[in-house]
């Protein structure tokens, strides 16, 4: 078994928009072929190789199943350095949106209605990010701009985690 990237490992087209059912079926097929139990009577070297392939298949599936991780993977495969730790430059409109969401998060800690409103708004932001990334990657092949959107999406996910951890005070 040889595969240069996660998509070819599963025999899928290299694109952002993926059918999750097709992805899962492809993962199950690969996982069944390389499952270590199939190599129980094989040599130690063959068992080790099977274990490595199983781990690789699981990691590839984890990254492709999550739309944000998939977008990040595609950008990195295209040679885009996302500089997630050092590049904080973002669109001014998105920076304003961040500030607004931060204020909403403060309100959400005290108000169940604000909590629900912010959760819904972040879910809509996720959907918009997915649509934008599908267009940037699959239609335009603009991985640089997609990288910028991935960094924005990472902020949205971080804020969503903070929101989940925040419980409105009664």
From Swiss-Prot:
Transmembrane stretches in the record are: none
Keyword hit for Transit peptide: no
Ranges for domain J: 5-79
**Subunit info?**
Interacts with HscA and stimulates its ATPase activity.
Which residues, by range, are in coiled-coil regions? none
Q: Which InterPro entries does its entry note?
A: DnaJ_domain, HscB, HscB_C_sf, HscB_oligo_C, J_dom_sf
| Record key words, sorted | Chaperone
UniProt xrefs under PROSITE patterns: DNAJ_2 (PS50076)
Protein name, as recorded: Co-chaperone protein HscB homolog
Describe the function of this protein: Co-chaperone involved in the maturation of iron-sulfur cluster-containing proteins. Seems to help targeting proteins to be folded toward HscA.
A molecular function annotated in GO for this UniProt entry is: protein-folding chaperone binding
Q: Does the keyword Chaperone apply?
A: yes
What the entry lists under SMART domains is as follows: DnaJ
Entry GO CC? iron-sulfur cluster transfer complex
Regarding protein family, the annotation reads: Belongs to the HscB family.
Instruction: Name the GO terms of the biological process aspect.
Output: [2Fe-2S] cluster assembly; protein complex oligomerization; protein folding
Task: Tell me which species this is from.
Answer: Bordetella pertussis (strain Tohama I / ATCC BAA-589 / NCTC 13251)
């Amino acid at each position: 078994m040889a595969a240069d990237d996660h998509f070819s490992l599963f025999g899928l087209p290299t694109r952002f928009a993926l059918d999750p059912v097709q992805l899962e079926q492809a993962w199950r097929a690969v996982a069944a072929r390389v499952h270590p139990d199939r190599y129980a009577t094989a040599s130690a070297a063959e068992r080790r190789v099977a274990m490595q392939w199983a781990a690789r298949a699981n990691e590839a599936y984890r990254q492709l199943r999550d739309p944000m991780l998939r977008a990040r993977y595609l950008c990195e495969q295209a040679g885009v350095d996302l500089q997630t730790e050092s590049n904080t430059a973002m669109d001014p409109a998105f920076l304003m949106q961040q500030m607004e969401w931060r204020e909403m998060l403060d309100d959400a800690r005290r108000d169940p209605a604000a909590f629900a409103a912010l959760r819904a708004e972040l879910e809509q932001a996720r959907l918009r990010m997915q649509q934008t990334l599908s267009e940037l990657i699959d239609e335009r092949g603009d991985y640089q701009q997609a990288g910028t959107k991935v960094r924005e999406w990472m902020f949205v996910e971080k804020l969503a985690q903070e929101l989940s951890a925040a419980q409105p005070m009664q």
